[in-house]
Amino acid sequence: MKKLFSMLVAAALVGTMAMAAQAVPQVPADVVIDHLSNPNAKLEYKVKFSHKAHASLGTDAAACQKCHHKWDGKSEIGGCATEGCHADTTSFKATEKDPKFLMTAFHSKSPMSCQGCHKEMKTAKKTTGPTACAQCHNQK
């Protein structure tokens, strides 16, 4: 009886671990964000983004939802330019405040944006990513 109980407990643990492994989304190591293009700009719009470095801040649903704020925690995670999120790529003004603009996803003061989160961390004297234009965008 003890042997049967031990086997059932072991099977339950293996099943639980397998389900947990499936729940964690696969994270690409690096991503190139290149949805915007402005030939008149002095800086490149294309940005190399280390998804792996950001994923190291946490792999639970809440950590992913810090940036992927429309993700339900179960379905496939979409990028910022996904329809229904920041799909409008027509604005090149970093001061644009409408959340539908892709530029807003990266440059607003909100802690859900790249720049907003980095500045919030910098204010809290935590290790952070870039907060100035040329730190992300290369000169043309």
From Swiss-Prot:
Domain of life where this protein originates:
Bacteria
User: Signal peptide position in this chain?
Assistant: 1-23
Subcellular location per UniProt equals:
Periplasm
Cell inner membrane: present as a keyword of the record?
no
Residues that hold heme c 2 according to the record: H69, C80, C85, H86
Any one GO MF annotation of this record:
metal ion binding
Keywords associated with the record:
Calcium, Electron transport, Heme, Iron, Metal-binding, Periplasm, Signal, Sulfate respiration, Transport
Question: What are the binding positions for Ca(2+) in this chain?
Answer: D34, L36, E44, Y45
What this protein needs as a cofactor is: heme c
Residues the entry annotates as binding heme c 1: H51, C64, C67, H68
Among the GO biological process terms of this entry, one is: anaerobic respiration
Q: Name one GO cellular component term.
A: periplasmic space
| Positions of heme c 4 binding | H107, C133, C136, H137
Report the principal subcellular site: periplasm
Q: Where does heme c 3 bind?
A: H54, C114, C117, H118
Task: List the CDD domains hit by this protein, alphabetically.
Answer: Cytochrom_C3
| Cofactor: record remark | Binds 4 heme c groups covalently per monomer.
What else the UniProt entry mentions is: The second heme binding site has an unusual CXXXXCH motif.
Name the job this protein performs. Exchanges electrons with [NiFe] and [Fe] hydrogenases and with the acidic cytochrome c3. Participates in sulfate respiration coupled with phosphorylation by transferring electrons from the enzyme dehydrogenase to ferredoxin.
The name on file for this protein is Basic cytochrome c3
Q: Which organism is it from?
A: Desulfocurvibacter africanus
> Where is the organism placed in the taxonomic lineage, from the top?
Bacteria, Pseudomonadati, Thermodesulfobacteriota, Desulfovibrionia, Desulfovibrionales
